[in-house]
Swiss-Prot record:
A Pfam family that the UniProt record links to this protein: Complex1_49kDa
Enzyme class: translocase
Name this polypeptide is given: NADH-quinone oxidoreductase subunit C/D
UniProt topology in membrane: Peripheral membrane protein
Organism: Pseudomonas savastanoi pv. phaseolicola (strain 1448A / Race 6)
Amino acid sequence: MTADNALYIPPYKADDQDVVVELNTHFGAEAFTAQPTRTGMPVLWVERARLFEILTFLRNVPKPYSMLYDLHGVDERLRTNRRGLPGADFTVFYHLLSIERNSDVMIKVALSESDLSVPTITSIWPNANWYEREVWDMFGIDFPGHPHLSRIMMPPTWEGHPLRKDFPARATELDPYSLTLAKQQLEEEAARFRPEDWGMKRSGANEDYMFLNLGPNHPSAHGAFRIILQLDGEEIVDCVPDIGYHHRGAEKMAERQSWHSFIPYTDRIDYLGGVMNNLPYVLSVEKLAGIKVPEKVDVIRIMMAEFFRITSHLLFLGTYIQDVGAMTPVFFTFTDRQKAYTVIEAITGFRLHPAWYRIGGVAHDLPRGWEKLVKDFVDWLPKRLDEYTKAALQNSILKGRTVGVAAYNTKEALEWGVTGAGLRSTGCDFDLRKARPYSGYENFEFEVPLAANGDAYDRCMVRVEEMRQSIKIIDQCMRNMPEGPYKADHPLTTPPPKERTLQHIETLITHFLQVSWGPVMPANESFQMIEATKGINSYYLTSDGGTMSYRTRIRTPSYPHLQQIPSVIKGSMVADLIAYLGSIDFVMADVDR
């Protein structure tokens, strides 16, 4: 890291600094190599031989790091700006989160290409299972001791590991694809479920089990998603979620797009989240660039993000009630979504995927008359939410299908990496907009809805109350919108203000280069998490000092939420699974990326 870059590195929070002191005291400072980054958290490299005991210590320390927030890898072989870092061909990183401390720490381990293996940590955090499978799938890194190390995103017949730097990034770099009859039969056979591979028995002491495919094309699966159910009659003995059907290689595409041109791709992660997807990405890029946006930009971003929180929750509400048998409410919620999209389209020019946030600002200023459109919606929705609560959510049939169904507690939620409404429905008061305010959320008055039972019904009610709080936030944005520019006055703001290109040739040249070639970001690492529609979403960016990201890690909330399914639904009925799936509120693009 260069000295100039180090000037922008923020100090750790007190709680983050405390864990560094605890680690140094217990293991000795020589056990760690600290990496200065712009992630805002301690990043510590450790030897592979000590990784397991260090992670175990963090899992059991007072005020523990109860959540394995993320685990993934980096191919370091082409990275040029690595001064001061341990030698590595590949890196595996472990991002840990402590709710009690409101603290993060990242542990990294360096690997050589000749010895790509790290001990599994599934005995410490159960949600490491899928993350380790994905790292093996994408990079070919082995995890000895893993219960079932197999492909998870790519088909079982896939050859190669796509996130390696020597793996082609475009279809034109591969041989033409053809599907012969023999190959089709091979693919079909590879998809066959074999219970023995997953430690399941085909029969018990007095019964034969039935194995049922739910999906990958089933309306209650909410996307291309398969769950193989082991059934004893209607009772679910065990199940295996099968994902990856929607995988498009979003993290690989980020390595071939400029920092600016990748923004539209973020919209397609949680495709119901709209600009909510743009926010963690542009905030992370702005950390790399050292950009501080004007106050007006913060308020506009918050207002539009909350609009998309509402549209996403309205879709959830209508389809969830439909999943348990009530057909009418979905038409009402779609009417309300249309009213929201009328406002969104008037402001951004688009509906579902505006790709409207920019590095350093937003695409353009608010249009004339935007206040009336926003006010009309703010006045409209609360009365509709009252109707939904009275007519549908207090319905005895819906309650009978959801109260006490698929319940889990805070401890279980944290162990599986659950965030958002799923975590808060257990009574855990953790909302990033309050706990770690970003983009100026600390300037707004709103409450964090909580529940106590952690069941399917509570998850629904938390989201309904979140819509009420979003309305309060939008109303405050409307009433207190600051004056000022909609883009930061910074050399790396992309694109720079258009009006200046008509007056200054230097600005015109910069505009041309940044749009066509892309802005050059300082070599460093940055990270930003936000409270998205489905839970916590984050972007962890690695810049090698170029116009494109060296590595973009997209951590989505829906991924761990689906991994949790077997632990929650065993012993329940198939009908309970349908109610549970609806209450999770996921989209498969958010899972598969």
